[in-house]
């Protein structure tokens, strides 16, 4: 096992612990708490994959961070912060929409790279909007936190989420996953729109109504793909 992989996991565990202590003081905002929950799932998945105990990794991660901070001057810290590009966190969904459990009558699921696509294929003839919470850097999607498909009534009928055991995805991965989700939902005569935020950073739809920029023939092909593979 690569030593950098192990030490990276150990540092991530300790930094998560610090963020959790901060949240326990009731000082974290909604995006902060949202990332905290998602990162906890990711760390559990990575720990299982690596065969490492999280508590032990956290203690070792603390030692690594302490050694770094001992050698870090205030001036070097300022320069480091100034050189790091700013990441923006964009939220379509409320915390309630993000955390709400949902159930499928006809569950369908597909794993595409490090993303999991889920949908309820019992849903027919509904108006559906895709909403997402994600981070952006250099005006491009950096990390998808969660994307969900909601009906006009607010019911959740589909989602795209990162797999905790397979961290890392590109904006192109997210775009492809959105196409698969839309194709599957439209197969059942649902009308699907995407939020303005998703259009701008993850989908770049040319349809002013928020629909996907796919010709009908390609939509049908994509729908058949999801029908056979999910």
Curated annotation (Swiss-Prot):
Residue ranges, annotated region (CPSF4-binding): 180-215
High-level lineage: Viruses, Riboviria, Orthornavirae, Negarnaviricota, Polyploviricotina
Chain intervals for the UniProt region annotation (PABPN1-binding): 223-230
Main localisation: host cell
Family per record: Belongs to the influenza A viruses NS1 family.
Post-translational modification: Upon interferon induction, ISGylated via host HERC5; this results in the impairment of NS1 interaction with RNA targets due to its inability to form homodimers and to interact with host EIF2AK2/PKR.
Protein localization: Host nucleus; Host cytoplasm
UniProt function note: Inhibits post-transcriptional processing of cellular pre-mRNA, by binding and inhibiting two cellular proteins that are required for the 3'-end processing of cellular pre-mRNAs: the 30 kDa cleavage and polyadenylation specificity factor/CPSF4 and the poly(A)-binding protein 2/PABPN1. In turn, unprocessed 3' end pre-mRNAs accumulate in the host nucleus and are no longer exported to the cytoplasm. Cellular protein synthesis is thereby shut off very early after virus infection.
Region listing for RNA-binding and homodimerization, in residue ranges: 1-73
Keywords for this protein: Eukaryotic host gene expression shutoff by virus, Host cytoplasm, Host gene expression shutoff by virus, Host mRNA suppression by virus, Host nucleus, Host-virus interaction, Inhibition of host innate immune response by virus, Inhibition of host interferon signaling pathway by virus, Inhibition of host PKR by virus, Inhibition of host pre-mRNA processing by virus, Inhibition of host RIG-I by virus, Inhibition of host RLR pathway by virus, Interferon antiviral system evasion, RNA-binding, Ubl conjugation, Viral immunoevasion
Domain of life according to the entry: Viruses
GO biological process, one term: symbiont-mediated suppression of host type I interferon-mediated signaling pathway
Domain comment in the entry: The dsRNA-binding region is required for suppression of RNA silencing.
Alphabetical list of Gene3D superfamilies matching this protein: Influenza virus non-structural protein, effector domain, S15/NS1, RNA-binding
Pfam families the record matches: Flu_NS1
Motif (Nuclear localization signal): 34-38
Name listed for the protein in its UniProt record: Non-structural protein 1
Disordered: annotated segments: 205-230
Cellular-component GO terms for this entry: host cell cytoplasm; host cell nucleus
Motif (Nuclear export signal): 137-146
Xref: HAMAP family: INFV_NS1
